[in-house]
Amino acid sequence: MSDRFVIWAPSMHNEPAAKCGYCHGNKGGNMDQLFALDSWAHRYMNKMDVVKIENCTIGSFVEHMDVATYDRMCNMGFRRSGKFLYKVDPLRNCCRLYTIRTAPQELNMTKELKKCISRFATRITSEDYCPAAVASSDFVGKIVNAEMNSKTFYTRFEPALYSEEKYHLFVKYQEKVHQDYNNSPKSFKRFLCDTPFGPEAVLGTQESWEQLNNWQRMKPGEKLKHMGPVHECYYYEGKLIAITVSDILPSGISSVYFIWDPDYSKWSLGKLSALRDLAIIQRTNLQYYYLGYYIEDCPKMNYKANYGAEVLDVCHSKYIPLKPIQDMISRGKLFVIGEEETKVTKELYLVDSETGRGEGFPTDNVVKYKNIAEEIYGVGGCAFKSANESALELKELYGIPYEEEDLDTIYHLKEHNGHAPNGIPNVVPGLLPLWELLDIMQSGKITDLEGRLFLFEIETEGIRPLINFYSEPPNVKKRICDVIRLFGFETCMKAVILYSEQM
């Protein structure tokens, strides 16, 4: 069962945009930026008093998954908060959140970043320290040389577990930097310690921690032994001054959170931590640095572009360099890459191969690409008609309780009396389209889940394999389809779905 993906049935969580931690429902007078596409803004800009702009998240609590599975999930647009695995609905959400990643060789060492490293080296080394000769562009060498010659600064990788020392720094940071006074040991553990990974990934081995804590000495080609969540604690003159919370994945390091002591604000610890993570990635022979989400119209999130980056096109499950598409996503808009001559008639086929996700988009001639998001997901887009047709067939032929959804349910008009979606909507960019789900039914591929997928009903406390999809109750069929749409068919084959008849 070590590779099983044990999850609660997925659900959609909507709350007013005012509760969004990024825009707070206010785009500084540019209210059209609350909409994913211009056609939706034009449709509703004069009806803002009846439109419900929301913060829309789709996800699932995960009881267990392996690190390799989470690596794939990151390359599908997911992030985790403790045990909650989620992604946003980029069509309905008030902000467009794009998975962003970079690599050491992509970093543009600006004057500001060079100063950050230089000041750091000066602070942690003695006056008689003579830096080893390294190329001016070798930021990794400069960081490594300074740290290995410091008698006052060091870091320590350790399991992502609670300690009073870490918690006290967390509270100080939250209160002084974010004016957040609603903290507790329980919330700290839930956010920064709880994980869906097994004990072998959380606790590691003495050998794996020793190797990680000597990352500066790793040889080219040497394989990193530890994969899983970590806390890297920064110490200066014996005092804990910062904590990097990360997940080390087969393809790279995923940044979860960074905590720093406000008394050391002049150190630019946020910039330093990103530079150090990139240095660690290079020396440990990993590939990518996942910086979380990028939001083009949010200063708290768009600084990530400074590290050289590519963002995920969730409809292709592929990455594309950020610079060539910045005009496409300006003013908080949704993008889906397509070739100039491409004419789309339905949502794009979503790659369902575990090996096909997370690759770079072919960008030999980026100029030939255009944004086809309007053609698919705009007011006159092809996605909705196609999805409604598939929804009716899925219901009539296979007893899966999908319903038609009309356009005015997209932004939940306050006075609208038509059918509103129940649960995960029919059309969500980055989820398996309903026409593709219908193909799975019509081809008989759905039977590949039988004997492989397991179901656990909370009321009966009984676990059972799926024996015959077609004979399952409608609500169970729908839950299975939600998992397929959200996480992919191949992942569903190794899933255990926990569900309650009361939910």
Swiss-Prot record:
Reactions performed catalytically: an N-terminal L-alpha-aminoacyl-[protein] + L-arginyl-tRNA(Arg) = an N-terminal L-arginyl-L-aminoacyl-[protein] + tRNA(Arg) + H(+)
Places the protein is found: Cytoplasm
Disulfide bridge partners, by residue number: none
Annotated keywords: Acyltransferase, Cytoplasm, Transferase, Ubl conjugation pathway
The keyword Transferase appears for this protein: yes
GO BP: proteasomal protein catabolic process
Gene Ontology, cellular component aspect: cytoplasm
Presence of the UniProt keyword Acyltransferase in the record: yes
EC code(s) of this entry: 2.3.2.8
UniProt enzyme class: transferase
A GO molecular-function annotation: arginyl-tRNA--protein transferase activity
PANTHER family in alphabetical order: ARGININE-TRNA-PROTEIN TRANSFERASE 1 (PTHR21367), ARGINYL-TRNA--PROTEIN TRANSFERASE 1 (PTHR21367:SF1)
Protein family per UniProt: Belongs to the R-transferase family.
Annotated function: Involved in the post-translational conjugation of arginine to the N-terminal aspartate or glutamate of a protein. This arginylation is required for degradation of the protein via the ubiquitin pathway. Does not arginylate cysteine residues.
Miscellaneous remark of the record: Present with 2030 molecules/cell in log phase SD medium.
Protein name: Arginyl-tRNA--protein transferase 1
